[in-house]
Design a protein with these regions (language model features):
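Bacterial Sec-dependent N-terminal signal peptides
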Residues: 1-22, 493
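Outer-membrane beta-barrel translocator/receptor signature
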Residues: 36, 48-57, 63-139, 227
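Outer-membrane beta-barrel porins/channels
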Residues: 19-33, 38-39, 106-493
Length: 493
């Protein structure tokens, strides 16, 4: 019996790409995890303003404040992710914590011109989260060997062989520098005796046999967030037109682990099981600009905001481990200690939001935000000419425009405020069911120099999870039932 283990820890740069359209969606998606009042009104503040988290929605929101204030929030997510793969259902529970903090200074009656008020502020909050923990398990007639076979298509056998004077480590490094990610996957499978090569047909074939289906288990754990720091300037002209500018700094950090296990091959199969692990560490930074307007028309307010693309630079580190157990061989372990290192850029699509709000007798407020984003405008790039042409072409073909909706309302009853809202975010990938529907609610108390707010949301997030990007492309249906709680305290001065 033979165990082939390939494990990589030595850091080196890879001449190739492993990013795909799912990465483009993740880097472009905006969840806007703000303070309690912002959440409880469905993140709908595009024409209302006057909220620290609302600055991230519309830069003109800052000059709606009458007094300066600072505030902070604690956000707690309770998730239950249910997966359905080939009729087998699993569920995993998890809890995650986030935060929000901001401050804004308001200057009124400054000079004798038509600039009645202006403000400077800074706000920090999570723009998106990458925390997930779920299990996909079931019987399948397709094997992960197809992933390796697809990556081996067109690969020359002499390039993934280990010759005299070479090592697993040196060949793997050479493949990364010269051919990239796909050839490395073929190398893993060939050296682990999952794939063999037919000299007559000049093609690779799998040594695994599975006529009666396979048992598969895929565990996914990810921790990370896209944090956004916003520097805001806003003013009001002639007591009618609020306008503002945001300069945004983005920071992305993600740690993810994907463990795929497959067994129950035929009794005469040369392969007994496959255990394939991928650990990915992503670190990125970016910059974006926002412009916003809010125009007052009697009891109504009309808002408009434009978000520029976000220009990101990324550094990824990929650790891989492939273990294949085969019959009729003595144990053997190969451990070259390699880390794949990728440097690349991503430009997210721009976004436009139109808002309408009304305030009735300073008691009842209503707001509607309609946001448009063209996901196909996302673009990967690197110093390698043409490296991302096929990936970007795939984005243009498969990602569509989306329209998202946010509705919020607030009723003031003295020091008590009652709030509610709806969030609807749609999926740019037309071939999948993948959207977020959230119902939000909350309440708050306004004291002489402070406020205390509580916000809650219930969400059903539907998504199809595809096991691999090629070959084994079977999908599991995921439903994330999430309950989010936020508590916020603000000081007014």
């Amino acid at each position: 019996m033979r165990y082939i283990v390939l494990f990589y820890f030595l850091l080196f740069s890879v001449n190739g790409v492993s990013q795909n359209l799912y990465d483009a969606i993740n880097y472009s998606f905006e969840e806007e995890i703000g303070n309690a009042r912002f959440l409880s009104m469905g993140n709908s503040f595009g024409a209302l303003g006057g909220n620290l988290s609302a600055i991230s929605k519309n830069p003109a929101a800052g000059s709606v404040f009458e007094l300066s204030r600072s505030g902070g929030s604690i956000v707690i997510d309770n998730n239950k992710v249910e997966s359905d793969f080939k009729g087998t259902v699993n569920s995993v529970n998890s809890t995650n914590t986030y935060w929000q903090a901001g401050i804004i200074y308001v200057f009124k009656n400054y000079g004798k011109g038509k600039i009645n008020k202006f403000s400077f502020g800074i706000n920090a909050q999570s723009h998106n989260t990458f925390n997930k923990d779920f299990l996909v398990e079931g019987r399948n007639n397709n094997s992960v060997d197809s992933f390796f076979l697809n990556n081996a298509n067109g690969v020359r056998i002499e390039n993934i062989s280990v010759n005299s004077g070479e090592t697993i480590q040196s060949v793997y490094r050479w493949l990364g520098n010269n051919y990239g990610y796909s050839t490395q996957q073929a190398f893993l499978a060939y050296q682990a005796y999952l794939l063999n090569y037919d000299e007559d047909k000049k093609q690779f074939y799998s040594l695994a046999k599975f006529n009666d289906g396979l048992s598969q288990r895929n565990e996914i754990t990810s921790v990370g967030s896209n944090n956004k720091i916003t520097l805001n300037f806003s003013s009001i002209y002639n007591n009618k037109l609020h306008f503002g500018l945001n300069l945004n700094i983005h920071e992305i950090n993600i740690e993810s682990r994907n463990n795929f296990f497959e067994n129950n091959y035929d009794t005469d199969s040369l392969v007994n099981y496959i255990d394939f692990n991928n650990d990915l560490y992503i670190k990125g930074g970016g910059f974006s600009v926002q412009l916003g307007l809010i125009y007052l028309i009697n009891k109504f307010r009309v808002g408009f905001s434009y978000n520029s693309p976000t220009w990101y630079s990324f550094e990824d580190e990929l650790y891989q481990k492939l273990e294949v157990q085969s019959e009729d061989y003595n144990p053997d372990i190969i451990d070259p200690n390699i880390i794949n290192y990728y440097e690349y850029n991503f430009r997210s699509p721009s976004k436009t939001t139109i808002s309408l709000a009304t305030i009735v007798k300073n008691m009842l407020a209503l707001n509607l935000d309609i946001t448009s984003k063209k996901y196909s405008n996302g673009k990967f790039s690197s110093n390698l000419n043409g490296a991302y042409e096929s990936v970007n072409s795939n984005l243009n073909r498969n990602l569509s425009d989306v329209i998202d909706y946010n509705i919020g309302t607030e009723l003031k009853l003295g020091v008590l405020s009652l709030r509610g809202g709806i969030i609807r975010k749609n999926n740019p990938l037309e071939s999948e069911i993948n959207h977020i529907e959230s119902t939000t609610f909350g309440f708050g108390f306004e004291f002489e120099n402070s406020t205390l707010d509580f916000g809650f949301s219930e969400s059903n997030i539907q998504k199809n999870y595809q096991l691999f990007d090629t070959g084994l492309t079977d999908s599991a249906a995921l439903i994330n039932k999430r309950f989010r709680s936020v508590i916020t305290y603000n000081l007014i001065f």
